[in-house]
Amino acid sequence: MFKRKSTAELAAQMAKLAGNKGGFSSEDKGEWKLKLDNAGNGQAVIRFLPSKNDEQAPFAILVNHGFKKNGKWYIENCSSTHGDYDSCPVCQYISKNDLYNTDNKEYGLVKRK
C-alpha cells in the first residue's frame, strides 16, 4: 500500500512548502488571467466546442420533481435522469392521474381558467 518515507525526506518537503508563502506561484505560464483595462473592467469570449461524441449531450440533463403537500415539500431527483422512466413513482402517478392524459376535455376546461 503506502511506503514509509524517511523523516528527513518529509522534513525537506515541508520546508519546501513553507518557503512558498501562498502555496501558489503567480508566475505560472499555463494559467490564463483576464486582462483588465485602467477602469478595472475585463472582457472575454468563451467558445463552447462541439463534443467528441455526437451522441452525447454537451451538458448534463437532470430531471427532478418538487411540490408541496400538507405543508411539507417533496424535492427529489427523478430516475428518468438516468434513463429509467418506469421506476419513478412521481412520473407514474402523473401519467395515471394527469387530466391531459386521462380526460382531455376536462383538461381543456381547467386550462382555460
From Swiss-Prot:
GO terms for biological process: DNA recombination; DNA repair; DNA replication; viral DNA genome replication. Residues 3-7 are annotated as: LAST. InterPro entries: NA-bd_OB-fold, Phage_T4_Gp32_ssDNA-bd, Phage_T4_Gp32_ssDNA-bd_sf. Zn(2+) binds at residues 65, 78, 88, 91. The keyword RNA-binding does not apply. The keyword Repressor applies. Keywords: DNA damage, DNA recombination, DNA repair, DNA replication, DNA-binding, Metal-binding, Repressor, Viral DNA replication, Zinc. It comes from the Viruses. GO terms for molecular function: metal ion binding; single-stranded DNA binding. Homodimer in the absence of DNA, monomer when binding DNA. Interacts with the DNA helicase assembly protein; a ternary complex between the helicase assembly protein, the single-stranded DNA-binding protein and ssDNA is an obligatory intermediate in the helicase loading mechanism. Part of the replicase complex that includes the DNA polymerase, the polymerase clamp, the clamp loader complex, the single-stranded DNA binding protein, the primase, the DnaB-like SF4 replicative helicase and the helicase assembly factor. Interacts (via C-terminus) with the viral SF1 dDA helicase. Single-stranded DNA-binding protein that participates in viral DNA replication, recombination, and repair. Coats the lagging-strand ssDNA as the replication fork advances. Stimulates the activities of viral DNA polymerase and DnaB-like SF4 replicative helicase, probably via its interaction with the helicase assembly factor. Together with DnaB-like SF4 replicative helicase and the helicase assembly factor, promotes pairing of two homologous DNA molecules containing complementary single-stranded regions and mediates homologous DNA strand exchange. Also promotes the formation of joint molecules. The acidic C-terminus is involved in modulating the ssDNA binding properties. The N-terminus LAST motif is involved in the cooperative binding of the protein to ssDNA. Belongs to the Tequatrovirus single-stranded DNA-binding protein family. This is Single-stranded DNA-binding protein. It comes from Escherichia phage SV14. The lineage of its organism: Viruses, Duplodnaviria, Heunggongvirae, Uroviricota, Caudoviricetes.
